[in-house]
Amino acid sequence: MAFTIAVAGKGGVGKTTTAGLLVRYLVENDLTPVLAVDADSNSNLNEVLGLELEATLGDAREEMKKGQSQGMTKDLFIEMRVNQCLVESKGFDLIAMGRPEGAGCYCAANHLLTDCMDKLAANYRYLVVDNEAGMEHISRVTTERVDLLLVISDPSRRSMTAAQRVQELAQDMKILDGPCYLILSMVRGEASPALLDAAKEMGLDLAGVIPDDESLAEWDLAGKPVSQLPADNPVVQAAYAIFDRVVPRE
């Protein structure tokens, strides 16, 4: 099975940017193939990676629930739609979970979807999951446990408290089968002693700091994929230094 890395944190803290840079890091270090999974209902990992997204697994789930399986058995229909949702690229592929569930029971669709995702993930060396702050969607992606959890936070107390909750939730759900690290993002200057002390008090193992960089926002506003930032960009360099320390070479 693939080595599963989940990236989580509340919105607006650089979570998806970090996930995109992680995919790029794995590809550049020949740790391929990689399956990137956008498990955030507000799907935009594709934009960070510079890919067009035409369909999501949420669409397939809705179609199956409404009986729109085109005369196929449900398992064959889900398998077909999963393959249609897969966006292929050099060294990695992307798939998005898409819209959240509507009203009614989705148990059958979710069960088939998880089985199909497990089969798909078996073809990859690494699985990178861009997750929402809540870890509920991880069970839709794989029945395997998470090998590495990276929790992203900005340097605010509120965001770090959310990061602490993510770590506790992962432990309570018993989905974590490896270490959990905190990555502080969008930090101006050096991380203050008070910030480092707060992380320690919350039981968060700090892996490193990614600086705040104006060129990141300018790059994004220009419509350029953040994952294609120049190699000498401070954000890229800081992220890669962290990945060098925490990502095992499977």
Features from the language model and the residues they span:
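C-terminal alpha-helix
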Residues: 238-250
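Short, hinge-like loop/turn segments at secondary-structure boundaries
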Residues: 51-55, 169-170, 197-201, 225-227
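Conserved catalytic-core segment of NTP-binding enzymes
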Residues: 111-209, 218
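Conserved beta-strand scaffold positions in the cores of enzyme catalytic domains, especially
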Residues: 4, 36, 92-94, 206-209
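C-terminal boundary of histidine-terminating zinc-finger modules
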Residues: 222-233
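N-terminal phosphate/diphosphate-binding loop that engages ATP/GTP or pyrophosphate donors
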Residues: 27-90
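Cytosolic-facing regulatory segments adjacent to core modules
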Residues: 78-84, 88-89, 93-129
